[in-house]
Curated annotation (Swiss-Prot):
It comes from the Eukaryota. GO terms for molecular function: toxin activity. It comes from Cryptogemma periscelida (Atlantic gem-turris). Signal peptide: none annotated. Turritoxin GpIAa was only sequenced until Lys-33. This is Turripeptide GpIAa. Its main location: secreted.
Amino acid sequence: RYGRSYAMSHMPMSRMGRKMYQNYMYRRMQATKMMQYH
């Protein structure tokens, strides 16, 4: 998806950036799940 390439171009592929990106994707996934439930 476009989100990954966007993050890669805007974030240095360091361990910290990768962790932040994974955390963001995880939170986004949880948000979409909640939206589906409601």
